[in-house]
Amino acid sequence: MNSGITVEEMFTIDVNCDYLGVSRLMLMENAGAEVARAICSRFDVKDKRIVIVAHTGNKGGDGFVAARHLALLGAEVIVVLIGDPSKIRTFEAKRNWDVICEMEYSINRIIVKDSLRMDLLAKALDKADIVVDALLGTGVRGTLRPPISEAVKLINKAKDRGAFIVSIDIPTGISPNTGEVLGLAVKADLTVTHHKPKIGLLSNKASKYVGELLTVNIGVPVEAELFAGPGDVLITMKERKLTAHKGDFGRILIIGGSKDYSGAPALAGLAALRSGADLAIIVAPKVISNAIRSYSPNLIVREYDGEYLNDKGVELALNEAERADAIIIGPGLSFRDEVVNSVLNLIDKLRSTNKKLVIDADAIKACSKDKNVLRDIIGVITPHAGEFKILTGIKLPNEEKN
């Protein structure tokens, strides 16, 4: 089974896909088609009554796509929209809603704007063979409330009567990051999750609601995860409220500098502050600590004895890392045996903390001595052409050096 991902990681991937030319509309089409394919691989859907219970978000959009594909295969398809069509939240979901609105012959649409007409859903579910949960997905927040909670109860009653329940991506009512039940949740027979399972699906708390877990490919390029893109930036941006205080917007730790280089870690710290971080803490040898401080009073310097990164520096860095949101390792460290051993030791110990790392400059060269240390890190590696060759043994063509 694929390892799980968080909601935030999936958001990053979606944004990066769009940047690479794989639009959200394409991803939605693939997701809905895969749901239909999963159903058709288990049932002969011709003349089966399939009720798709959708809400106004992107999970609803996936359901609209699935409805279209299932109708083309001869199923009796009913789409029940819980909510007002005018409040469908995204362009992609609205586009697919508009499509099924034109399919009046093959798809029956029912609109339940509020709890007062929940009888319409109950009637639609009464003789359903298959029910598709397209209500709430990764955007769920807090305990379910009416009319969604009432819809979930009716879906579970349909299951008790023998209907087969399929949840798209994650059963409605399950927290995608923790697996906790948010008051109540759909009890699915099959959950068709996109790209990779959301980590909540893999928890014991969610196991009796997930049913069979099927992970499907929706066309996410490898590059959307392998390389940093706009999504990796957007996910870090927070609304800056008037009530915010120091530390709310990031504490960045820079481990760099040596007797030879004092400017590189200072510039990294200034760049962190310029990018919006609240605090930039630099762990550096004592011999250059005052030089770094001279760049700006906003830089916090933690110093250790020695001229290059050593065991004392690693110990200090690990202590500072406990409170850091992200850690930059490398600028100005120099490339010496003592530094290489210290860098490898530091990264190895940070791997188990799940801290976000940036491996830069001389730290990249150090990692070339033992590339296994980079396995399973959460981070970004920032080589220029020369460092890329040292790390991988691959020489980039001249036109790609920049």
Tell what function each PLM region has.
Residues 93, 97, 148-152, 188, ...:
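Amphipathic alpha-helical segments in well-structured domains
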Residues 61, 86, 140, 144:
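Phosphate/ribose-phosphate-bearing ligand recognition and processing surfaces
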Residues 2-5, 125-262:
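YjeF_N-associated NAD(P)HX repair module
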Residues 97, 112, 128-136, 324-332:
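Small/polar-residue-rich loop-to-helix segments that shape phosphate-bearing ligand pockets
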Residues 42-46, 124-129, 160-162, 321-323:
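Glycine-rich phosphate-binding loop signature in dinucleotide/nucleotide-binding domains
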Residues 1-83, 89-90, 94, 201-361, ...:
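Small-residue (G/A/S/T)-rich helix-start motifs and N-terminal tracts that mark the onset
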Residues 65-128:
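Gly/Ser-rich phosphate-binding catalytic loop and adjacent alpha/beta segment
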